[in-house]
Amino acid sequence: MNNAIAQQIAEQGGVEAYLHAQQHKSLLRFLTCGSVDDGKSTLIGRLLHDTRQIYEDQLSTLHTDSKRLGTQGDKLDLALLVDGLQAEREQGITIDVAYRYFSTEKRKFIIADTPGHEQYTRNMATGASTCDVAILLIDVRKGVLDQTRLHSFISTLLGIRHLVVAVNKMDLVAFDEQIFQGIRQDYLRFAEQLPVDLDITFVPLSALEGDNVAALGKAMPWYNGPTLLDVLETVEVINLNEQQPARFPVQYVNRPNLDFRGYAGTVAAGVLRVGQAVKVLPSGVTSTISRIVTFDGDLTEAWAGEAVTLVLKDEVDISRGDLLVDAGETLTEVQNAQVDVVWMTEQPLVAGQSFDIKIAGKKTRARVDNIQYQVDINTLTQRVADSLPLNGIGLVELAFDEPMILDKYADNPTTGGMIFIDRLSNVTVGAGMVRQPLQDVYREPGAYGEFELALNALVRRHFPHWGARDLLGGK
């Protein structure tokens, strides 16, 4: 047990009171990003150190490792707290996304330390996909670089609206205010070109020395703003998913015995309640929620982000990949969509290629009909392109093999986000965010021709192993 936790337990009167308080603290997910050697891992190590989140054995090991592998002379190399891979320690860089957890009296945090090297940009995008805030580090000696712009754009593309620009290594320029202000103006000029409105906070700091990280440093009397930790503890993040219409992608059909059939998954948006009428898509069948089951007991309602198992009143044909929505909501099935793509493999993306696509629990296939443009990261302008290279970002049009229920990524990242999977190697090669669903192919149940209904009945009767659904919504 570290000293900070021990002190909180003592102050709150025991372990149970401490755990109860932890459950009711808000959770903030943030990532550190930016160019290589800007000090991302050192900053996280400093946060953990100054908030007393390091255990005694970890601190002892850190002293030993700093002498053997450290790059800071006689000082503790705090980056070693985060860089756990042998290759990371040997090269002094971050390769994989490293997650760390800590808490203060005001909030709980999950940190994603992401790599700055261009070849690991895909790892950075992975880390950003679940975060609320991005800490963008800038080396005060180098200013705004290409990777700074790239990581800023990817963060906004993935829905992050709060950026903290941490101008690091101020100790190496004698804490010069003019240099800091120059970088601030350069970044603001760049940010004006980003496609969304952002909440941007600038903090000058020294991760190595600790100035303005968890406490204000005396070396910068000209700075009268908050520390980095103050920003993280007070930033207001609104869970927009709770305000959206209900979405429940089915991940797994839970059938432990003949007396129980439940549909497991995470509520992607909105709220679901016992007694609520829901519609199953794509079949269109309706039923009512009879139970909301969790490991800790039944709930009366489940909000966005909660993992639950739903039990319905009726025996309904539901499988992995189906979507449960409110019964009164009319959704449109589409077979084409405009999708923002971050390409993650050395083999370029070209029009005409087909991929396996995974959206929430559903796996399907899609073809890239065309690449509408590629984004020039330096200028954020659009340019004509017939392919997307590794780390390329662009807008493509996808044609799915079957009608799909899609939301815009900005409205719902779960039902509007996807990954591209190579059909031969089964490797994830890209990430996609639905910009705009296209081509209405929706038909109300019953709006089928006589021939279609007869063919559907024939297939279901003689070829049940094909898994065809009843177009009339029956079993």
Swiss-Prot record:
Swiss-Prot/TrEMBL catalytic activity: sulfate + ATP + H(+) = adenosine 5'-phosphosulfate + diphosphate
GO biological process: hydrogen sulfide biosynthetic process; sulfate assimilation
Region listing for G4, in residue ranges: 168-171
Residue ranges, annotated region (G1): 34-41
Keyword GTP-binding included in the entry's annotation: yes
Region (G5): 206-208
One GO MF term: sulfate adenylyltransferase (ATP) activity
Span of domain tr-type G: 25-240
Lipid biosynthesis found in the keyword field: no
Keywords tagged on the record: ATP-binding, GTP-binding, Nucleotide-binding, Nucleotidyltransferase, Transferase
Enzymatic class: transferase
CDD domains the record matches: CysN_ATPS, CysN_NodQ_II, CysN_NoDQ_III
Residue span of region G3: 113-116
Pfam families according to UniProt: GTP-eEF1A_C, GTP_EFTU, GTP_EFTU_D2
Pathway: Sulfur metabolism; hydrogen sulfide biosynthesis; sulfite from sulfate: step 1/3
InterPro entries attached to this UniProt entry: CysN_GTP-bd (IPR041757), CysN_II (IPR044138), CysN_NoDQ_III (IPR044139), EFTu-like_2 (IPR004161), G_TR_CS (IPR031157), GTP-eEF1A_C (IPR054696), P-loop_NTPase (IPR027417), Small_GTP-bd (IPR005225)
Binding annotation for GTP: 34-41, 113-117, 168-171
EC identifiers of the protein: 2.7.7.4
Subunit structure: Heterodimer composed of CysD, the smaller subunit, and CysN.
Family as reported in the entry's similarity comment: Belongs to the TRAFAC class translation factor GTPase superfamily. Classic translation factor GTPase family. CysN/NodQ subfamily.
HAMAP family: Sulf_adenylyltr_sub1
Function: With CysD forms the ATP sulfurylase (ATPS) that catalyzes the adenylation of sulfate producing adenosine 5'-phosphosulfate (APS) and diphosphate, the first enzymatic step in sulfur assimilation pathway. APS synthesis involves the formation of a high-energy phosphoric-sulfuric acid anhydride bond driven by GTP hydrolysis by CysN coupled to ATP hydrolysis by CysD.
Protein name: Sulfate adenylyltransferase subunit 1
Organism taxonomic ancestry: Bacteria, Pseudomonadati, Pseudomonadota, Gammaproteobacteria, Enterobacterales
